[in-house]
Structures are given as C-alpha cells and as structure tokens.
C-alpha cells in the first residue's frame, strides 16, 4: 500500500455534501486540482482543497487551497 493518499475536496455552494476525489499519486492529484483553477469553478464551489493523508503517521496535511 502507498504511504500517501491525496484528496481533492470540492466544497459545494448548493449545500450538498462535499465531492472528494482520491488519488495515490501526487502529480495526478495536483493536475486534477489545477484543472479547476478557473473562474467557472466559483459558480459551483466555495473552496477546493488538495490534501495528503500519511498512512504511517495518520496525519492529514493541506497542500493547497483555492477559495472563491
């Protein structure tokens, strides 16, 4: 099992539950995160966050945040 899991979390404006995409590779997670760095994302989301979970320590770390 990989040591890290990366998550892109989309906080929705409509009050529905957050959408979460999980990735095992940082490069793919960052690519997905960057795809939403555009003005149209502000119409659906209040925030998009890229985080990393360390399975050895159990710690979560926020790597990047976009706030609209």
Kindly label every feature range from the protein language model.
Residues 22-25, 66-68:
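Solvent-exposed serine/threonine-rich low-complexity stretches and specific carbohydrate-binding patches
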Residues 14-16, 27-29, 56:
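Residues that cap or initiate secondary-structure elements
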Residues 23-47:
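A short, charged, amphipathic alpha-helix used as a generic interaction element across diverse proteins
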Residues 1-16, 45:
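Short aromatic-glycine-(Arg/Gly/Cys) micro-motifs in beta-strand/loop hairpins
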Residues 9-11, 23, 51-53:
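Predominantly extracellular/luminal cell-surface or secreted proteins
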Residues 6, 29-32, 64:
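N-terminal leader/targeting signatures
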Residues 38-68:
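Short, mixed-charge low-complexity intrinsically disordered segments
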């Amino acid at each position: 099992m990989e040591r890290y899991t990366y998550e892109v979390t989309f906080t929705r404006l409509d009050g529905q539950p957050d959408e979460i995409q999980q990735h095992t590779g940082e490069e793919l997670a960052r690519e997905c995160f960057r795809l939403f760095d555009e003005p149209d994302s502000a119409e659906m989301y209040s925030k998009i966050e890229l985080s990393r979970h360390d399975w050895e320590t159990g710690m979560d770390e926020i790597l990047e945040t976009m706030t609209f």
